[in-house]
Amino acid sequence: MGPASGGIVIEHLVKRFGERAVVDDLNLHIQPGELFVLVGPSGCGKTTTLRLLAGLEPVSDGRIYFGERLVNDIRPRDRNVALVFQDYAIFPHLTVFENIAYGLRARHAPRNLIRERVANAARLFRIEHLLGRKPRQLSGGERQRVALARALVRDAALYLYDEPLANLDAQLRHQAREDILTLHRQKGQPAVYVTHDQAEAMALGDRIAVMRDGKLQQVGSGLDLYERPCNQFVAFFIGSPGINLFEVEVHPDQDGGLRLVHPAFRLPVPEEFQARVAPYTGRRLNLGIRPEHLQPPKRADFAVSEDSTIRGLVNVIEPTVSGCTVYLSTLEPTPRDFVATLKARLPGSYLGREVPLAVNLRKIHLFDPEDGQALLHGPLATDDRPIRVTVSPSGEPANGPAEQPTSERETSEASTQREEQA
């Protein structure tokens, strides 16, 4: 059984444990050949969603389709799904070869095909020299690679990954991501990958769905989520360090413009945003500034004016490969902590000193303080259209703007609709 041309469709999916809905009215359309990532904090419902797709948990309400076929009542073994878990789930009494071959043997695959596929998978995951060993003779990273090889050696309708790289060190994790992407493109079937690591989600996902408390927050490419988050939660969750948030008021300026006023600064609203911000004059809003959009005035690669800076007291300096991350606090009676990711090193002598940082005003975000929904974003890095990265049924990536299914488009374009209403 395979998803055919329709991919995987999830309609109004609900999973309850007692009175609590851990997955609440979830709607998704996973395209054929797409590597789709579910990301969110612990307890958001992402692993439960994966288990519902696999048939390991009964559906409380809603529908799951593989292609045109409703699979709600189909047994896990009959869904033709391959799973990789964080806890390896390999058989301790079998050799590495036997573990990898287990699923193929259970489906009575020819011996020559089993040998060929096991050899190819072992080569891809660099475990050829381990085929005769038992799991107790392997390291944690080697066991995880065996689990990946066992799941990916067979032809499945859907591949499911539940934080499979969490137990690997940084170098192995990076290599394993490349291996998963390589094999995914070869297979050409849809895959759903669960992680709490937003960096991993950005690296792997053709599209990413952000979940919180069982509810879908937003679906889009990594760039779309980063530059056009639909609410404050997505804005803070996607990005490291998280976005800075300041409570500001919109005030008219003497020259007929508008300013975002905070006890520590009075930032001018760029001319291209004036019409969209004007309806909020006199109201409180939450201003979002990404850490990399704060730079020393003389080193900024964007337009800087005297009144487009925020002064802060340097509390911590963390050197990075390309610059440094600086933790500061505003100079008001009640200091507000914020963070800047600088492209240049800041000497340790700046600790405890006051420094000005220029704000890239064309990259600001504004949110409603009541519900956290986005009201305004600056333009995308490339153009004003939401960017999607889709894949063809063969698994080859096809870059460029692409249309979303209606249920997802309504979620990820909520902020755009609010901007137009303004």
What are these regions (language model features)?
Residues 35, 76-82, 86-237:
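ABC ATPase nucleotide-binding domains
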Residues 61-70:
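Conserved ABC transporter NBD signature motif
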Residues 253-422:
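Non-catalytic connector elements of ABC transporters
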Residues 54:
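Helix-to-loop junction immediately C-terminal to a conserved catalytic motif
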Residues 39-41:
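The feature captures the beta-strand-to-loop junction immediately N-terminal to the Walker
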Residues 47-50, 146:
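ABC ATPase nucleotide-binding domain helices that frame the ATP-binding cleft
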